[in-house]
């Protein structure tokens, strides 16, 4: 190998490592070490939950925000009950979705989660749901199922399902 070729290869490698290092610095865990949602995880789930539950949430902004905050607390409890390997996978998914590249690639969303309208996030979720790529479908399934489970674990939401509650025995 000539010295000039070796030098070019070295410079290209250094540039690639610098870019990869910069991307790695952008990735923040989706979950805290104790299993609660990190700030980036909360950002993703706030947008996702608002889009999934749009017609079930109050149109009043303050009540809606209170419902979403309560939902995020229930998501924290749900995620903390998951086994460690599932928490690790969810943390990776949320970390990826919190980056620009991950959000664009996996969710097909071109704008940051907080700036996207409910309709745009709904469209993004639908594209994940009906994607030909299994990884996008699985990501949608995880986000949807966690959101729905946490939402309907609250007794106040049961009437939306027509569920009167457990039958009293005795």
Language-model region placement:
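C-terminal segment of N-terminal export signals and the immediately downstream linker at the start
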Residues: 1-5, 17-59
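Short, functional C-terminal segments
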Residues: 153-170
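Sec-dependent signal peptide hydrophobic core
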Residues: 10-14
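Flexible, low-complexity segments enriched for small/polar residues
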Residues: 38-153
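Generic structural signal for short, solvent-exposed loop/turn connectors between secondary structure elements
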Residues: 28-37, 132, 139, 170
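Short, hydrophobic/aromatic alpha-helical segments in well-folded domains
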Residues: 2, 6-9, 124, 146
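Glycine-rich, flexible loop/turn motifs
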Residues: 33, 109, 157-159
């Amino acid at each position: 190998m000539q010295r000039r070729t070796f030098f070019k290869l070295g410079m290209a490698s250094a540039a690639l490592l610098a870019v990869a290092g910069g991307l790695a610095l952008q990735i923040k865990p989706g979950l805290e070490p104790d299993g609660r949602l990190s700030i980036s995880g909360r950002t993703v789930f706030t947008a996702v939950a608002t889009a999934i539950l749009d017609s079930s949430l109050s149109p009043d902004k303050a009540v809606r925000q209170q419902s979403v905050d309560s939902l995020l607390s229930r998501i924290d409890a749900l995620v903390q009950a998951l086994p460690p390997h599932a928490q690790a996978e969810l943390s990776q998914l949320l970390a990826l979705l919190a980056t620009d590249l991950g959000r664009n690639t996996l969710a097909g969303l071109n704008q940051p989660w907080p700036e996207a309208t409910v309709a745009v996030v709904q469209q993004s979720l639908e594209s994940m749901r009906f994607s030909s790529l299994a990884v996008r479908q699985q990501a949608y399934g995880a986000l949807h199922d966690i959101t729905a489970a946490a939402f309907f674990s609250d007794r106040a939401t049961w009437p939306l399902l027509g569920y009167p509650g457990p039958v009293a025995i005795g």
